[in-house]
Each structure stands twice: as structure tokens, then as C-alpha cells.
């Protein structure tokens, strides 16, 4: 098939997947494991039905749920900043300001889950993310429809509709995956059964931008 006349144009929101460099991946896991007794619980500001939700970084307004703190080194910040910047550039967003709002880790065990939700930081506009830090050897028995596994899955739900639209994304997640998507893109994590644990990181980057200024940018 000759595709020399092909060009790609899409309407709607996008999810970008990156691979985390091994050094960044190791640093984050090391901080979580060695600093665990010092980590601030993040449960009060999250919707997850998860016991172990802990914050690594917060730079939003002080409130009764969380105060400012940081356990991440500069090279990790720089890597996050580069990836969020790439997302905005790839989506041709212009004239924006970014502010790194928060980073936390969810460590999930059997039957725990994250219901469908969206994110926000200090602003309602911005980018969220999911980084896969650890996975169990198995997500357990699929009690039905084993050919379409759901246990332990991340599902990201798009807001586009109409013929031929991709309305959801359910990747075959692997350790060191890093997914970036807009704050208002709904997503969920299904429970699994059996031994082991599933450790993921979420990071929120506030993005101040003018949607009118960005309308029709190409």
C-alpha cells in the first residue's frame, strides 16, 4: 500500500507513553522503600480504595490535608519536567506556564482499587500521569472472559465520541511505563486477586494556558 500521501491529524485528547530511564526508576523506588517511615499519608486527598498511599512531593497551597514537602532529587524533577514539556509540545500547546504540583505513590494489594476519577492540582488545568514501579507476577484468576483480562488493569477513558473514535485505552502495562494525559481525562485501576503488590506513581503538573489562543494551532 502506498502511503506517501499520508498525514496524521487527530481531534481530541491524547495519552503519551514514555519509558522511564533505569536510573530514574531505581531512584524513585529506592526513595519510597528507604524513606517509607517518613512519608506523609496522602489518603485524605485521594479517592483510591487503597491503604498505602504516600506523598513524595507537594507544592500546592498548605491545607488541612497536606503541607509542602519534597523527597525527590533535582535530576528526577528535571526528567519529569522534560516529559511534561514534550507532551505539550507534541500537542502543539503554546504560551503556557507549568508548575509541578504533587507526586505520590500508590501501593496496592489484593482487592484494592482506584475508582473512576479525574485529577486537579492548584489549577483545574494540567497534566496527570501514571508510572509503573512494581507489578505482581500475576493479577490472579479471571473468573470469566479470560481472553479479555481486566484484573489489575489501568483504563483511561476518553471524552471523544462518534464513529471510529477511540473511547478508551487499556494498555498492557509494564514496569517503567510512564503515561501522561490531561487532568480531566477519567481513569481507573481495577483490583487484582492473589499475592504480590502493584506499585505506581502519580505526578500532577499544573498548566496555565489560554485555550482560545491555542484554538486551531497546527
Residue locations for each model-derived region?
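Non-heme Fe(II)/2-oxoglutarate
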Residues: 1-95, 111-114
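Short beta->alpha connector loops
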Residues: 110, 185-186
Amino acid at each position: 500500500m502506498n502511503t506517501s500521501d499520508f498525514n496524521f491529524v487527530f481531534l481530541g485528547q491524547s495519552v503519551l507513553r514514555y519509558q522511564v530511564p533505569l536510573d530514574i526508576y531505581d531512584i524513585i523506588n529506592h526513595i519510597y522503600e528507604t524513606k517509607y517511615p517518613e512519608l506523609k499519608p496522602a489518603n485524605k486527598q485521594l479517592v483510591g480504595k487503597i491503604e498505602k498511599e504516600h506523598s513524595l512531593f507537594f507544592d500546592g497551597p498548605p491545607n488541612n490535608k497536606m503541607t509542602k514537602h519534597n523527597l525527590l532529587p533535582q535530576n528526577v524533577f528535571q526528567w519529569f519536567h522534560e516529559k511534561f514539556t514534550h507532551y505539550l509540545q507534541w500537542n502543539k500547546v503554546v504560551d503556557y506556564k507549568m508548575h509541578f504540583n504533587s507526586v505520590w505513590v500508590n501501593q496496592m494489594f489484593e482487592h484494592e482499587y482506584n475508582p473512576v476519577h479525574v485529577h486537579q492540582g492548584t489549577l483545574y488545568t494540567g497534566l496527570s500521569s501514571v508510572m509503573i514501579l512494581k507489578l505482581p507476577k500475576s493479577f490472579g484468576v479471571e473468573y470469566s472472559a479470560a481472553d479479555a483480562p481486566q484484573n489489575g488493569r489501568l483504563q483511561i477513558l476518553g471524552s471523544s465520541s462518534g464513529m471510529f473514535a477511540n473511547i478508551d485505552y487499556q494498555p498492557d502495562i509494564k514496569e517503567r511505563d510512564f503515561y501522561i494525559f490531561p487532568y480531566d481525562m477519567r481513569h481507573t485501576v481495577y483490583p487484582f486477586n492473589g499475592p504480590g503488590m502493584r506499585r505506581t506513581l502519580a505526578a500532577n503538573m499544573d498548566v496555565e494556558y489560554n485555550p482560545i489562543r491555542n484554538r486551531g494551532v497546527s
